[in-house]
Design a protein with these regions (language model features):
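Conserved PLP phosphate-binding loop immediately N-terminal to the Schiff-base lysine helix
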Residues: 1-3
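Conserved core segment of the aminotransferase class I/II
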Residues: 8-78
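Conserved C-terminal alpha-helix-loop-beta "cap" of PLP-dependent enzymes
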Residues: 111-149
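Inter-domain helical "communication" segments and dimerization helices
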Residues: 65-69, 120, 172
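Conserved glycine-rich beta-strand-loop-beta hairpin in the small C-terminal domain of fold type I
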Residues: 77-88, 98-111, 126
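Residue-level recognition of strand-loop junctions within catalytic nucleotide-signaling folds
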Residues: 34-35, 65, 111-113, 153-155
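PLP-dependent enzyme catalytic core of the Aspartate aminotransferase-like
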Residues: 127-128, 141-173
Length: 173
């Protein structure tokens, strides 16, 4: 909680939600701001919202107050760390190396083998029901085409790695 107070003093307004960590169906978020702004921000929220999901708010309140959200997050961190490790382990034999090994999160940016273009890999893969995010979709940097982003929560299928291997082989020849 102390961190949030520090954020409120330094940053003008910070908002977030629980849709990525708890459930996409829980459309309930939070805002961190200077205490003197909260009433006005609450009024603005009420004035611009068409509905309020009381059930979602009650579920969230319960999860936050009874400790189940904290337990859920701890388990989620363990699952994501395993998914990150497994994804990186599966990619390395293909010559796909993490640009940086993330300490947490759902994404890992990887550097493709020399001479392999991310957009070509993504085109091949999409035709084989594998959707990837090439670096040049995110950046205009001259080397962006050498990078690809993987969502580790969606990278636990052997079909992905077989398709990647085939795409790299085709692109390299």
């Amino acid at each position: 909680f102390r961190t949030f107070l520090i954020i409120a003093e330094v940053i003008l307004v910070f908002s977030g939600s629980f849709s990525k960590t708890l459930s996409a169906s829980i459309r309930c978020g939070y805002i961190i701001a200077k205490p003197e702004w909260i009433d006005q921000l609450t009024d603005l929220k009420i004035a611009t919202s068409f509905s309020h999901n009381g059930v979602s708010a009650e579920v969230l309140l319960s999860a936050l107050t009874d400790g189940s959200y904290r337990k859920h997050i701890e388990l989620l961190k363990v699952r994501l760390a395993k998914a990150m490790h497994d994804t990186i382990t599966q990619l390395e034999p293909l010559g796909i190396k993490p640009w940086i090994k993330p300490q947490a999160g759902i994404f890992v940016w990887c550097h493709l083998p020399k001479g392999v273009e991310a957009s070509e890999i993504a085109k091949y893969c999409i035709n084989h029901q594998v959707i990837l995010a090439p670096g040049n979709a995110f950046s205009q940097a001259s080397n962006a085409g050498q990078f690809i982003r993987f969502n580790v929560t969606q990278s636990n299928h052997d079909h992905i790695y077989k398709t990647l291997a085939d795409a790299i082989q085709q692109e390299s020849s």
